[in-house]
């Protein structure tokens, strides 16, 4: 268990704050703690809901890097309303609008449908 805790601490970038109580941590580090808890038992599928919401740009970069790294060894299901997040970390995109799948493809296929991610999202959800 100690080896797994050390690995998850390193993966999630928690080493600098390891001895601090969670209530004293920034939102970014608290997000990382949640990710570490989810990873502790090595799940095949990791589900993340808005993992960068409310984070500063440096924290967003770090969390996105961690998500990309984790995606190399497991399935990561990411729920987000931030389209730049989709482009930064996803290799498959599913848009759900009013309970129906309106797009299922790669970020490249999504970009090919319009000038910007916002435009594509608007087209798919305004019909």
Where are each of the predicted segments found?
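Conserved beta-strand-loop-alpha-helix hinge in the C-terminal portion
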Residues: 100-122
């Amino acid at each position: 268990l100690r080896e797994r805790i050390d690995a998850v601490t390193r993966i999630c970038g928690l080493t600098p704050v390891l001895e601090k109580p969670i209530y004293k941590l920034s939102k970014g580090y608290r997000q990382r703690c949640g990710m570490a808890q989810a990873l502790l038992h090595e799940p095949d599928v990791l589900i993340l809901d808005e993992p960068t919401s409310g984070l500063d740009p440096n924290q967003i970069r770090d969390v996105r890097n961690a998500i990309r790294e984790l995606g190399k060894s497991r399935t990561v299901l990411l729920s987000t309303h931030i389209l730049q997040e989709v482009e930064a970390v996803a290799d498959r995109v599913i848009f759900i609008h009013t309970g129906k799948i309106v797009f299922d493809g790669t970020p490249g296929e999504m970009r090919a449908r319009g000038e910007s991610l916002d435009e594509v999202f608007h087209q798919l959800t305004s019909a």
